[in-house]
């Protein structure tokens, strides 16, 4: 079991949800590197939390892969989505709008919130632009220096990983399973910590939990299949019994008609209405 868990751990990369959750949690350097490369400027991250749960005013719960703040009160939500079709723009827009509520909970006045970024790394061109990085400014606010971008949604196509540009190197690092081959030191160290260091036990426990969940789901699925199969057999048996009873009733009906049993008596014996007997006799080709 231990070797199986470690083998699964060694196959994981930063695009895998559970591994990413453990690797990036609290790692300001690694998350700062991600944001800095995507925005093409140095960003100093002051706070990081993975799997940040937020509940809106209607009671709807959302979970953000990575929630971060920098030392200038800018806010970042970073999502990792292997299926680009699931990286829907409305979903990211909703995340962006929820960010302000989180920041206020941290004690930052609403008026001091500067910019809100939602960065989504996907294994494909979710933005349909053909670019490695696609940015959409969704809101503007007036400042004493004029209009300033307020909400920004950014898609990063992880498959755009050829060349030596920082974003291409980053994209290769995100899917690299062997942490020793990761180029950026910050990412290499956060992966090493989970695969060989103090985070390994946490990650192995999570893998065991996933395995237990999968086994439980498989048992539940198997039990459901057995139940459905038995119910199908019962339904089939009921239909066969019904058909057999109807066939027997028709045989009795035909026999009684051929022996000139009165209609009223036939209805009494077979517990059928006059109309039903007449209809069934017609279908059997019998003459009353």
Regions found by a protein language model. Give the residues of each.
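Conserved single-residue anchors adjacent to enzymatic active/cofactor-binding motifs
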Residues: 1-202
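Short, charged alpha-helical interaction segments and adjacent helix-coil junctions
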Residues: 1-12, 69-71, 76-81, 166-288
């Amino acid at each position: 079991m231990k070797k199986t868990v470690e083998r699964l751990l060694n196959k994981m990369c930063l695009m895998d949800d559970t591994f990413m959750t453990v690797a990036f949690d609290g790692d300001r350097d690694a998350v700062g590197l991600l944001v800095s490369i995507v925005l093409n400027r140095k960003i100093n991250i002051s706070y990081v939390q993975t799997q940040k749960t937020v509940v809106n005013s209607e009671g709807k719960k959302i979970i953000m892969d990575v929630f971060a703040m920098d030392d200038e009160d800018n806010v970042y939500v970073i999502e990792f989505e292997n299926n680009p079709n699931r990286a829907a723009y409305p979903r990211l827009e909703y995340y962006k709008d929820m960010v302000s509520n989180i920041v206020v909970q941290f004690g930052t006045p609403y008026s001091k919130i500067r910019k809100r970024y939602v960065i989504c790394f996907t294994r494909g061109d979710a933005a349909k632009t053909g670019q490695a990085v696609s940015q959409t400014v969704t809101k503007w606010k007036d400042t004493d220096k004029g209009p300033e971008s307020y909400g920004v949604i950014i898609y990063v196509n992880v498959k755009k990983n050829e060349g030596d540009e920082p974003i291409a190197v980053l994209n290769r690092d995100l899917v690299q399973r062997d942490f020793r081959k990761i180029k950026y030191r910050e990412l290499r160290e956060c992966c090493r910590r989970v695969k060989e260091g103090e985070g390994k036990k946490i990650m192995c426990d999570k893998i065991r939990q996933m395995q237990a969940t999968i086994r439980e789901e498989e048992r539940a699925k198997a039990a459901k299949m057995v139940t459905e199969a038995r119910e199908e057999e019962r339904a089939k048996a009921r239909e066969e019994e019904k058909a057999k009873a109807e066939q027997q009733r028709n045989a009795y009906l035909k026999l009684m008609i051929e022996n000139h049993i009165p209609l009223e008596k036939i209805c009494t014996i077979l517990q059928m209405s006059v109309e039903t007997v007449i209809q069934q006799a017609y279908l059997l080709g019998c003459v009353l």
